[in-house]
Amino acid sequence: MDHPKFSIIVPVLHEAERINDLIASLRQLETENNFEIIIIDGSPAKDTLHVIDDDRVTKISSEKGRAKQMNAGASVAKGDILIFLHADTELPSTAMKRMNAFIDRNKYVGGAFDLGIKSDKMIYKVIAFLGSLRSRLNRIPYGDQAIFLRRDYFNKIGGYREIPLMEDVELMRRIKRSGRKIWIFYDRVMTSPRRWEEEGLIYCILRNWTLQVLYFLGLSPHQLVDFYKTDYRRKRS
């Protein structure tokens, strides 16, 4: 394959049932540029990697942890633009066309997309709207909004901090402090509602808001993950 313009980096953990559908959806994206797909499995069993049908996909394993996995993917990426995609999120069909035209004409170092949730329920539409509005106001999109960055800039700032939570927020805050800008497209990624459905909608919303507030108040991600695990065990007991 010629030098790819884009590298789509997908950290996974036990996504064997979902991964081939995701890869198929990525192959349908509208683009005139070459792109590569890199799947990074955080499971020692490599169960997701074993079921991938597409032999064009770059498959690697790493230590568990989204930040560690994304950094591992970025370390082997060849594309000029890195797209960090969650396994339960789909890009809009014109995503790469939009990124290509925008990045080539502007001095922004990267960006993300508005949030969409694959559900007809009004509550999810409200969650998506508020999430998109928040990221436009504070310029800190979350990982489920398909963050993309120029590879040279990503390497320059040292990639993701390998912390257990809030790696996306920490990266965006670091970019803001450096004086660089990111752009958020009105085009929407579509993410699965599964985490809200599995954990309980109200619980998930309140837990996430609590974590965000505590993080912005100065608690470290390592303290937050202890809270997360304790709260999760309490809910399951």
Give short role names for the model-derived ranges.
Residues 49-76:
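Conserved donor nucleotide-binding strand/loop of the catalytic core
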Residues 94-123:
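Conserved donor NDP-sugar-binding/catalytic core segment of glycosyltransferases
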Residues 1-3, 173-237:
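Hydrophobic helical membrane-anchoring modules
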